[in-house]
Design a protein with these regions (language model features):
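Alpha/beta-hydrolase fold nucleophile elbow
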Residues: 168-180
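C-terminal, loop-rich substrate-recognition/catalytic regions characterized by aromatic stacking residues
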Residues: 24-26, 255-259, 354-649
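Short beta-strand/loop motif that positions the catalytic acidic residue
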Residues: 307-309
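Cap/lid segment of the alpha/beta-hydrolase catalytic domain
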Residues: 71-166, 214-215, 350-360, 490, ...
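Active-site-adjacent alpha-helix of alpha/beta-hydrolase-fold enzymes
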Residues: 105, 318-336
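Accessory cap/linker subdomain of secreted extracellular hydrolases
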Residues: 26, 38, 88, 95-99, ...
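Glycine-rich nucleophile elbow surrounding the catalytic serine of serine-hydrolase chemistry
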Residues: 178-188
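N-terminal cap/lid segment of alpha/beta-hydrolase-fold proteins
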Residues: 35-73, 497-503, 570
Length: 649
């Protein structure tokens, strides 16, 4: 053993050297910081007061909450939005001392909020932005998919409880409103709601991620949303960004191969939610137990609820109608209301006078906010409750561009005795004809070749990146209203068109695709589009001459023909029946127009490509699995239209 001094000498030497250095370094006076510990800015010119608080939940997690109170407010109702999209940004759309100015933007019907004198509250959900806790996409209710004692229902309850006890300017009445994911959260609030929750407005809500909202449609994966998944789930503050080096998104997705391979290339396997998507391609218990329409069908209807549906919603076109159908039969006291508007996703809070090339003759969104949303909120959130009651259903009728006030949905007219809805077959007949009514032609078929190496694009190329910034050429929200004439001439699209209409054809409700089709492969996708073909010349708006406007369209993945939870190979070259619903429509095909149906087997890159050979999980399809297939659409196929007819005397 070495002497102890030998072992400590290096340490002592180092310490002494440091001491000597400190002794030789000149000591300067400190330079005070020019940043105050807390900045108290001038607020005399502001017509609102903003407070930021961390509200504790029952498990101790604190959620970042921003409260904006009109200056001088007393006995004001509270309008709450819970969001994963950054609460701070939603009350900071502009740098201004004016309340309406800072609220004008996403998730805020600013005119209604300000005119109503409401206290605006925005909260980050757990795990996002300023809130504590762990983020789980569409966190399920406590149960088999969520063993914890907390979910969005309990978090909303705890938040409302805190708000009514800690905001002295309020009258203790709370409403909850939101769009998309933020529209899903009001639905969760309806499960065991807080007594102070007096009204809910779910707008374009996420409801069933497999059947027809964000993640799948009838089993076909919406790979266009992969950028959203990455940006939303891999960081707390959405700091990771999806990138592309391609001018055309079509090329980016083609070069990657399968959606699973693209996910691997982008590192999505690090995300728990992505791994759930990949592990649950069928409609199994994972999806069924989260479907909000199924959940709410088992709940009593106690809170007045206004569901808002956009007829050209590119993201959540299934949800609002599905919830309405689920809960309306249990509505004994007239608490369930519905709006259908001619908008894109979230379009009810924007300018609603136009949609792409379409002109509606008035600002439809402004009408809805002032004539429907404003009195609806006032009736339940104000102390006097003197606002007029709204109609059970307020539906915009496209084609005629008229608002209709109805007693229920679907309903052909305000007086349900004056008309009736009758299912009428639009036959896909020989000679590329669409024939309304009459007997089916059981002979023959139309044929096309579907090539996964050249899938049908979902819109005209080049396809801009998914996004909402029109200044950057991102027109994703309005693609459903794109002109479809480019696709009616393709050899891999079967097109059927009616004769010119001599009388109007009005439809209200859900068209049903009823295909008899075969494929030379062992799996196939079927896309059906119902289209209004404008006359070749439209004097009032020349740009609409010959326009082919999608009224309703969707996709069905053939492997689920015998059961949505049981994928099976298709029998090759055998005519098989496929029946699936298309999104709700409320439209009049006018005289001089024609009705068209397009059928195809890809819709790319909106949906991932079907390899057309059966594989256990398409996410993991290999390059050799993708093969051409010959598709036949038999003339016994039809689209069942919900036609409004005058009732028999």
């Amino acid at each position: 053993m070495k002497p102890i001094f030998a072992r400590i000498t290096p340490a002592l030497a180092f310490a002494l050297a440091g001491f000597a250095h400190a002794q030789s370094t000149p000591q300067y006076p400190g330079l005070p910081s020019e940043t105050p510990a807390e900045y108290l800015g001038p607020t005399a010119d502001f017509n609102y007061v903003k407070r930021t608080v961390m509200i504790p939940m029952r498990d101790g997690t604190r959620l970042n909450t921003i409260i904006v109170i009109p200056k001088g407010a007393k006995h004001a109702g509270i309008l709450l939005t819970r969001t994963p999209y950054d609460a701070s940004s939603q009350v900071s759309h502009a740098d201004s001392s004016d309340l309406e100015t800072i609220l004008t933007g996403y998730d805020n019907a600013a005119d209604v909020i300000v005119e109503g004198g409401y206290i605006r509250v925005i909260q980050d959900v757990r795990g996002k932005y300023g809130s504590e806790g762990d983020y789980v996409m569409n966190r399920p209710l406590h149960g088999p998919l969520n063993p914890t004692p907390v979910d969005h229902s309990t978090d909303t309850y705890d938040t409302i409880d805190w708000l009514v006890k800690n905001i002295p300017e309020s009258n203790g009445r709370v409403g909850i409103i939101g769009i998309s994911y933020d529209g899903f959260l009001p639905l969760m609030a309806l499960v065991n709601p807080h007594p102070a929750l007096k009204v809910a407005v779910p707008m374009n809500p996420m409801v069933d991620g497999w059947k027809g909202d964000d993640w799948f449609h009838n089993g076909a994966f919406r790979q266009i949303n992969m950028s959203y998944v990455l940006e939303q789930v891999v960081t707390r503050g959405n700091t990771a960004k999806w990138y592309t080096t391609n001018f055309d998104d079509y090329d980016m997705y083609m070069r990657a191969g399968s959606a699973g391979e693209l996910g691997r290339q982008r590192g999505l396997e690090q995300s728990g939610f992505w791994n759930k998507l990949v592990a649950h391609p069928a409609y199994d218990a994972f999806w069924q137990q989260q479907a909000m329409d199924k959940i709410l069908a088992r709940q009593p209807v106690t809170v007045p609820t206004l569901l808002v549906h956009s007829l050209w919603d590119a993201e959540d076109i299934y949800g609002a109608i599905a919830v309405y159908k689920a809960i309306k039969p249990h509505d004994k006291d007239g608490k369930v209301f519905l709006t259908l508007g001619p908008w894109v996703h979230g379009g009810a809070i924007e300018n609603g006078a136009t949609l792409g090339a379409l002109r509606f003759g008035s600002d439809t969104a402004l009408y809805w906010r002032q004539e429907v949303l404003k009195p609806f909120l006032a009736r339940y959130l104000k102390d006097d409750a003197s606002a007029p009651a709204i109609a059970p259903v307020t539906a915009f009728e496209t084609g005629t561009n008229q608002w209709r006030k109805l007693s229920s949905w679907p309903s052909g007219c305000a007086d349900t005795k004056a008309c009736a809805i009758k299912p009428v077959a639009l036959h896909l007949a020989a000679g590329d004809k669409a024939v309304l009514g009459g007997a089916a032609d059981d002979k023959g078929y139309e044929e096309y070749v579907s090539d996964p190496a050249k899938p049908v694009p979902f819109r005209q190329r080049p396809i801009p990146p998914y996004g909402y910034d029109e200044a950057k050429g991102q027109t994703w929200p309005r693609w459903l209203a794109d002109d479809q004439r480019e696709f009616s001439g393709r050899t891999d699209v079967a097109t059927f068109v009616s004769d010119v209409l001599s009388a109007p054809v009005k439809i209200s409700g859900e068209p049903i695709a009823s295909l008899v089709a075969s494929t030379s492969g062992t799996d196939s996708d079927w896309v059906v589009k119902l289209i209004d073909v404008y006359p070749d010349q439209v004097a009032s708006q020349p740009a609409m001459g010959g326009y082919q406007l999608m009224i309703s369209a969707d996709i069905f993945r053939g492997r689920y023909r015998e059961g949505l939870d049981k994928p099976k190979p298709l029998a090759a070259n055998k005519p098989l029946n496929y029946r699936f619903g298309l999104p709700t429509a409320n439209h009049v095909f006018l005289p001089g127009h024609r009705i068209m149906v397009q059928v195809q087997s890809s819709w790319f890159p909106l949906y991932d490509r079907n390899p057309q050979t059966f594989v256990p999980n398409i996410f993991f399809a290999k390059p050799g699995d993708y093969r051409k297939a010959t598709q036949r659409i038999y003339h016994s196929s039809f689209v069942e239209l919900p036609v409004v007819e005058a009732a028999a005397p």
